[in-house]
């Protein structure tokens, strides 16, 4: 059988790994073995964090909505409950955007939510009876 020479393929493979790891620090960007190992970890982290990003954005939206809601004398959970009772279907992403960029529209939604809540829920803590 003829001898198979793979120098070209091996060099191409190494070059592609080193090119992909060009932004890493130290040996991880210069030595093939270290670069290959780091590349595997990097892809794992990227996969994991693409999924984690969704939860992080949801937390950010909730924090923004809660801050704006408290500025309008209502808590986050009462706001969400009131919007559900008023049958207003606005997701948290849009609510957070309104809270940041359009305070008047957000205040209108807060008014809708407050109107939809039962009377004893709107009372401050300690005064409900």
From Swiss-Prot:
CDD domains, alphabetized: Ribosomal_L20 (cd07026)
InterPro entries hit by this protein: Ribosomal_bL20, RIBOSOMAL_L20_CS, Ribosomal_protein_bL20_C
GO molecular function, a single term: structural constituent of ribosome
Record key words, sorted: Ribonucleoprotein, Ribosomal protein, RNA-binding, rRNA-binding
Gene Ontology BP terms: ribosomal large subunit assembly; translation
Pfam families: Ribosomal_L20 (PF00453)
UniProt-recorded name of the protein: Large ribosomal subunit protein bL20
Source organism: Rhodococcus erythropolis (strain PR4 / NBRC 100887)
